[in-house]
């Protein structure tokens, strides 16, 4: 008990001692993104990671993290209001636009909300809203009302017929958002049913 009290008393001091210079971190992020943009002008692929030789490993837009790179660009634009970041964010967001019709993944929330969602939030571009609504429709096709869950992946070797992983929960925001924006309660109902059944 004495240890818990000591930890409770010292925790605020430890947190205070670890202040982060947010401006410095954003400057570093800007430098890293500028390097990536210079090294990877091809928007037909998504930047995955840096190799030891300074080149980049790329993935197709259907990769589940494809929205993170444009999402980061939108965050830089939000912080700086620098038009170069908005231009880059729009370019890389457009690169994942075709995924709005992707019915083969449960990760559309990651892919589309980070890119188009941040773009819509910051620019109010009505085209971004349309893309997000279509993305929600595509995600909703993975829901089986008889099972009451959104399927993570299509069947694959290993015997799983209807695989469902916890990560699906992180994509439900797209469905809640679409329900609110369109007035269609079916998106919300799918999200709630999936969440309730995931808890079982």
For the regions a protein language model found, what residue spans apply to each?
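Bacterial Sec-dependent N-terminal signal peptides
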Residues: 1-21
């Amino acid at each position: 008990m004495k240890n818990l009290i000591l930890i409770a008393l010292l925790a605020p001091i430890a947190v205070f001692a670890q202040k982060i210079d947010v401006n410095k971190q954003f400057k570093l992020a800007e430098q890293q993104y500028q390097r990536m943009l210079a090294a990877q002008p091809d928007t037909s692929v998504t930047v995955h990671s840096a190799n030891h030789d300074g080149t980049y490993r790329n993935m197709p837009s259907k990769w589940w993290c494809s929205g993170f790179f444009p999402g980061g660009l939108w965050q830089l634009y939000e912080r700086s209001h620098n038009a170069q970041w908005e231009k880059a964010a729009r370019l890389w967001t457009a690169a994942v636009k075709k995924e709005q019709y992707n019915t083969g993944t449960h990760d559309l929330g990651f892919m589309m909300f980070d890119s188009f969602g941040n773009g819509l939030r910051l620019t109010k571009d009505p085209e971004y809203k349309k893309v997000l609504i279509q993305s929600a429709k595509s995600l909703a096709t993975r829901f089986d009302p008889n099972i009451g869950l959104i399927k993570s992946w299509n069947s694959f070797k290993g015997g799983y017929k209807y695989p469902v992983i916890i990560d699906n929960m992180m994509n439900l925001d797209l469905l809640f958002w679409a329900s609110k924006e369109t007035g269609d309660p079916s998106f919300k109902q799918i999200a709630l049913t999936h969440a309730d059944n995931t808890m079982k």
